[in-house]
Structure formats: C-alpha cells, structure tokens
Amino acid sequence: QTEGSVGTVGVKITTDNYQDMLLTVKVIAKNKIVPVLDGEITATPITFGQILRVSTITGTMKDDGKTVEGTFDWTDSSTKPDKAGDYQAEWTFTPAEGYEEYATATGNVTIKVKPAELTVSVKASSMYYTGEEQIASIIASGQSVDSTPVTFTYSDKEDGNYTSGVPTFTDAGTYTVYYKAEAANHEPATGTFTVTIDPLPISLLSVSSISKTYDGSADVTLTADKLTFLSKTAKIKLPDTALSFSDAQFTSKQADGSYLPSPEVGNGKALSFTMTLTSNNYVFEG
C-alpha cells in the first residue's frame, strides 16, 4: 500500500452561466488501519467429518484500546480437517459498517477436532451342541464417517485379550462376547452380543442286546453305551455322564398285557428302565 501524496487530478467544471474552469485536486492516500486482537481468539470444537463452518469463532479486535466491531469467519469455511486432534485454521475479521477506516485482518487459531462416532452392529446366529468347540457365525458391520475400514476384535471377558477371532464355546448355554470396533480418527465403539448354543434334541432309537448271569434278581446294570439316540438325522451315543438310570429290570409280558419283573433264565425278555438326562447339553424331543 502507498500512503501520502500520490499526485494530482485535473477536474473540469462546466456550468451554464460561467466559463469552464479547470481545478487541480491533490490526491493523498491513507492506509486503512489494521485492528489487532485483544486477548486470545477461540473456536468451538467440531467433530471429525464436519467442516469449519460448524465451529464458532469468538474474539475481540481493537485499535489503540478501542474496540473495533465486526465479524469473525473462517477464511475457507468449507474446509474439512483431515484428522482428529488439534487443527490450525485461518480466520478472517471483517469490520462492521461504520468502521470503514479499518482493514480486514487474518490470523490462525487452533481448533479441536474430536474423534467421530462409529455406527456398528454385531449379531450372532444360534447353534446346537455338538460336543466340539464351536465358533458362532456373526455379522459385524461398522460405518465410519469417511469410509475408513472398521476393525473388530473380540474377547470372552470385558478386560480380557481381544483378538480378531470370535471366542469358541462347547457346552450348551448362553455366552456374552465383548467386542471393540476401531477406525482411525474415530472413538472406539465397544459392546456385547450373545452367543447361544442350544441343547441338542435327541430321541431314543434303540437299545443293544443285554444279558446277565442268573443271580435270582431281575435287576440289570444299564450304561449309556447300550443306548443309541437319534439327533436330527444322525445316530449318536451319549457319554455316561449325560445319563442316569433307575429301576432297570428284565420283565416279561403277562396274560393281561402287563409287564412284571422276570428274574428267571431265558430269552426274549423286555427291558424296563427309567433314564434321566444329567447334562444340559441334550434335551429329549417330544
């Protein structure tokens, strides 16, 4: 800018009653006053993914102790910070009407960019007990504000070791799995989902041939390996720990159709017993 005398300007004056006159006007330039900050300028925080326009700038400009009214705005309010944390941005101060002797002013201020929140959903399908360790089939989805990939990790304890693999479970029951979802410039999202292993439905299919040496009693010792069960379409054996037996006896059919204990030697006897499931991993159908 140039301040002081910058030259002259000739001005021709024409009227109806007088001769034309030529005036010489001396031109003097004076720079506008640039106001300065009175104290600090502040900006309200924004969230990653938002533009600077969301943030409000607060400050005061002065000139020789006198407040200069005007407005603060971002030099480029459409700017979107590329990361969370402290971000340096330029502001522009425009003097208000009535303060034309003042020039616009610019400067930088640190604006806090907070991590954005993730939108996540985790669901697990239920399973039936198989006797083996199982991993639940899950659907985990995560959405970040800038399409950054979301990484999921899992643990069977809230403060446990989180890994990319879903914990395995064996016995029937309901289990809580903890997850963390993370993406750059976003707050980690945590939560839980339930893994359910349902008891395996079974029905008695057959009993193996059983024999004993005559001892004068119809009582029989029965073990789980003598029984075959049907589960869905598969034939299975249950471990001894899954069943308990009571009142197991050889019986014979009477003339009236009833069955009575039969301790005598002979073949073709019926077997009568009561069995009780002692494992929560199975359930009788029907």
Feature annotation, model-predicted:
Residues Q1-G286:
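Short loop/turn motifs that initiate or flank beta-strands
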